[in-house]
Each structure stands twice: as structure tokens, then as C-alpha cells.
């Protein structure tokens, strides 16, 4: 399989791998909550976050109260129904992303944003720690104007909080409207539940997100 000459750069959509029409097959139920993965219940909402390797990210969110399901997948790129091998080539444009399905009556998008900002380094560009490549970029993919507004506001708040702690690096988090989300292979789903001693590179920078109504 061809690979990008520099996996730390974004891929031109015209140069992306073509992918396939058939989605990858995943287990119908979540290994931790036992809730069905599809369809998303009508009273639930969805959030998409990229914070580096999706194994640790998915565990972070399924451990939170009132989370219905989490799923590891790929989004933000061009290739349809990509495989993990294709993602690692740097020729799909996708990031490793976790889809969170939650009940907005019991949990808030603001709370999910707080977990997002405080549990990874959003100023590393196309990497997260020792994991290097565009697939590991920091990203928020929004599904509504309200989510988009909150995501942008939270980025501004977190940037100020970083500066107050003498961290003047610019945040590189991508915030865009969500495109297609493609489920990762089944062995990636709830990986750290199935493999408790598995790799997890997740870690924050010691900065807290201020309340959204605070300057």
C-alpha cells in the first residue's frame, strides 16, 4: 500500500485512497454498556472528538455517567469506509475519532467539551505525544450550530487558560461541521475494556477549562 511522504501533513482529497462501498462490520452491542450501537435513540445526541489514539479516548468517555455508547472510528477525511491500515498510510485524510452517544437531559455537551480539552494536548498539530501523523490530530466535529458555537467558545476559553499558565502555544484543534463517521474495525471497539493492559497515550497538559460563562 502506498503511504504519504509526510504523514504529518494534510492530504489533498484528490490524492486520497478510494476506499470501498461496504462499511466495516462491528458488534451490534457496546461491550461495556451492552446498549445497541445502531440506531441512535431519538432522545439521544451525538458528539465527535479526536484526541489522538482512540483507544484511551473511548475509555475516557464510556467511564462517564449517563453515556449511552461510545464507538471508535474515522472522520474528517475523504476515503470512504477506510481500514486502519489505510488510516496509517496518511492517505485518507481522516482522524481517529470517538463517537459519543449521550442523553442531553442527563449530560451536557459543555461537560463533554471539558473532558475533551482537559485530557489531551490540543496544541501539538498532527500528533499526540509519541503518536505522530494526521490521524492523531486534535479535532471536534460538530452536528449542530449550537455545538459549533460552544466548541468555538470553549477553544477561546481554553486558549486563555493556557496563556494564564504561561503556555503560549496556539491551539491547533480542528473544529468543523461533522462529515461521515466510519466505524473502525471491531477489534478497536472498546479496546481497553477487552485489553485492560493495552496502550493508552491519553494525557492532559494540566490546564482546566473555565466555566463557559466566565471570561
UniProtKB/Swiss-Prot annotation:
SUPFAM superfamilies: Peptide methionine sulfoxide reductase. Residues 1-27 are annotated as: Disordered. The active site is at 53. Keywords: Oxidoreductase. GO terms for cellular component: cytoplasm. Its EC number is 1.8.4.11. The keyword Hydrolase does not apply. One of its GO terms (biological process) is cellular response to oxidative stress. InterPro entries: Met_Sox_Rdtase_MsrA_dom (IPR002569), Met_Sox_Rdtase_MsrA_sf (IPR036509), MsrA_MetSO_reductase (IPR050162). The keyword Ribosomal protein does not apply. It catalyses: L-methionyl-[protein] + [thioredoxin]-disulfide + H2O = L-methionyl-(S)-S-oxide-[protein] + [thioredoxin]-dithiol; [thioredoxin]-disulfide + L-methionine + H2O = L-methionine (S)-S-oxide + [thioredoxin]-dithiol. Pfam families: PMSR. One of its GO terms (molecular function) is peptide-methionine (S)-S-oxide reductase activity. Has an important function as a repair enzyme for proteins that have been inactivated by oxidation. Catalyzes the reversible oxidation-reduction of methionine sulfoxide in proteins to methionine. Belongs to the MsrA Met sulfoxide reductase family. PANTHER family: MITOCHONDRIAL PEPTIDE METHIONINE SULFOXIDE REDUCTASE (PTHR42799:SF2). This is Peptide methionine sulfoxide reductase MsrA. It comes from Photorhabdus laumondii subsp. laumondii (strain DSM 15139 / CIP 105565 / TT01). The lineage of its organism: Bacteria, Pseudomonadati, Pseudomonadota, Gammaproteobacteria, Enterobacterales.
Amino acid at each position: 500500500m502506498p503511504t504519504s511522504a509526510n504523514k504529518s501533513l494534510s492530504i489533498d482529497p484528490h490524492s486520497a485512497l478510494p476506499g470501498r462501498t461496504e462499511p466495516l462490520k462491528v458488534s451490534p452491542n457496546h461491550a461495556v454498556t451492552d446498549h445497541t450501537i445502531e440506531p441512535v435513540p431519538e432522545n439521544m445526541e451525538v458528539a465527535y472528538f479526536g484526541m489522538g489514539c482512540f483507544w484511551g479516548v473511548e475509555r475516557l468517555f464510556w467511564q462517564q455517567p449517563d453515556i449511552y455508547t461510545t464507538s471508535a472510528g474515522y472522520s474528517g477525511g475523504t476515503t470512504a469506509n477506510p481500514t486502519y491500515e489505510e488510516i496509517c498510510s496518511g492517505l485518507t485524510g481522516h482522524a481517529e475519532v470517538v463517537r459519543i452517544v449521550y442523553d442531553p437531559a442527563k449530560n451536557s455537551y459543555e461537560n463533554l467539551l471539558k473532558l475533551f480539552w482537559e485530557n489531551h494536548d490540543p496544541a501539538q498539530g498532527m500528533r499526540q505525544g509519541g503518536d505522530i501523523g494526521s490521524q492523531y490530530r486534535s479535532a471536534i466535529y460538530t452536528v449542530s450550530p449550537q455545538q459549533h458555537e460552544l466548541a468555538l467558545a470553549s477553544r477561546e476559553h481554553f486558549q486563555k487558560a493556557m496563556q494564564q499558565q504561561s503556555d503560549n502555544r496556539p491551539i491547533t484543534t480542528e473544529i468543523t461541521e461533522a462529515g461521515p463517521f466510519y466505524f473502525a474495525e471491531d477489534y478497536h471497539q472498546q479496546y481497553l475494556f477487552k485489553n485492560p493492559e493495552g496502550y493508552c497515550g491519553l494525557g492532559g497538559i494540566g490546564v482546566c477549562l473555565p466555566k463557559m460563562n466566565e471570561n
